[in-house]
Amino acid sequence: MAGEKTRKILVDNRKARFEYEILETYSAGLALLGTEVKAIRAGRANLNDAFARIHHGEVLLYNMNISPLQTAGAFAHDPLRTRKLLLKRREIHKLTGRVEEKGLTLIPLKLYLEGSWVKLDLGLARGKKLYDKREDIKKRETKRDIERAMRR
């Protein structure tokens, strides 16, 4: 249909889903430089160790590594600079209240293209305990064993 935008996932933060329990997800735009967009499209972005914070009514993304392209030359960007996330004011106010709760944080989950726009799925998350992680691993292994047995 006309007007539908395709969604192409560029980077997926799989580690976040293992280490955190995701309570809510939000879709946010990113304020990027031109060289950063080119580098992201080339697959040079990394969401590991990235997190977001709310500072003076703005949501900022820290530690997202976007390696510059070699062709950027003098126009190369700082790979670890702080980037602003573009959310609606109502969403920011809602997140501000939720993040102030004990143990909740904002974690980037996916970086994707929606049409020509680079967007980020942001998750409101609570850290998992070690026994929760072990439980997830056990469930995954039993599921894998069952699938193997079914194939035989």
UniProtKB/Swiss-Prot annotation:
Compartments reported by the entry: Cytoplasm
Keywords from the named record: Cytoplasm, RNA-binding
Entry annotated with the keyword Cytoplasm: yes
Family matches, as InterPro entries: SmpB, SsrA-bd_prot, SsrA-bd_prot_CS
A single MF term (Gene Ontology): RNA binding
GO cellular component, one term: cytosol
Main location: cytoplasm
GO biological process annotation, one example: trans-translation
Matches recorded under CDD domains: SmpB (cd09294)
Superkingdom assignment: Bacteria
Family indicated by similarity: Belongs to the SmpB family.
Pfam family, one: SmpB
Coiled coil: none
Function per UniProt: Required for rescue of stalled ribosomes mediated by trans-translation. Binds to transfer-messenger RNA (tmRNA), required for stable association of tmRNA with ribosomes. tmRNA and SmpB together mimic tRNA shape, replacing the anticodon stem-loop with SmpB. tmRNA is encoded by the ssrA gene; the 2 termini fold to resemble tRNA(Ala) and it encodes a 'tag peptide', a short internal open reading frame. During trans-translation Ala-aminoacylated tmRNA acts like a tRNA, entering the A-site of stalled ribosomes, displacing the stalled mRNA.
The keyword Cytoplasm belongs to this UniProt entry's keyword annotation: yes
The protein, known as: SsrA-binding protein
